[in-house]
Amino acid sequence: MVSTEIEALVQQLARLPGLGPRSARRAVLHLMKKRESAFAPLLAALQTVSERLVTCTTCGNIDTHDPCAICADPRRDARSLCVVEEVSDLWALDKSRLFPGKYHVLGGRLSALEGVRPQDLSIDALVTRVAAGGIDEVVLAMNATLEGQTTAHYLAERLEGYPVRLTQLAHGLPVGGELDYLDEGTLAQALRARRPVG
């Protein structure tokens, strides 16, 4: 039997995505065995991020600075904008290092079942960014789900009439698949094979 404090830590870790009770228990045991080399640095990193965490007012990414590191990077191609549903999608795509541009996070996807409407997402901010000019291409990188494709179709309608080339990730992506669960090779192929919308 373990103390209530250790059990509380296991329960907190088990609440994280991808960690069940067994994995959380193993993680806690590892942290306790490697107390000096693992526990203290993890605690310090969590504390630092917790204190400095902000949402980028330009793109919606989560970082410790505003604007985020991607928006502030002058080497990024500001003429190319990739629209994603969630921050996890941005991180998955950016990890592939194949998209040289900047991003825009919607904060979800349209869903009649879940009651998510256009005004619940960062769509107006996207239209404002495009209307401001300087963007040549908008890549709609929605998940290959019914809601994702509905969102992409809605965005294509909202951006119609602006002088931008609309492209969409190729659908070698599995239907029903989510970007943050895909391997880098699949994401790379989808980015390379993007095609015009409509």
Swiss-Prot record:
GO terms for biological process: DNA recombination; DNA repair. Residues 79-174 form the Toprim domain. The keyword ATP-binding does not apply. A zinc finger (C4-type) spans 56-71. InterPro entries: DNA_Rcmb_RecR (IPR000093), Rcmb_RecR (IPR023627), Rcmb_RecR_Znf (IPR015967), TOPRIM_dom (IPR006171), TOPRIM_RecR (IPR034137). GO terms for molecular function: DNA binding; zinc ion binding. It holds the Pfam family Toprim_4. It comes from the Bacteria. Keywords: DNA damage, DNA recombination, DNA repair, Metal-binding, Zinc, Zinc-finger. Belongs to the RecR family. May play a role in DNA repair. It seems to be involved in an RecBC-independent recombinational process of DNA repair. It may act with RecF and RecO. This is Recombination protein RecR. It comes from Sphingopyxis alaskensis (strain DSM 13593 / LMG 18877 / RB2256) (Sphingomonas alaskensis). The gene is recR.
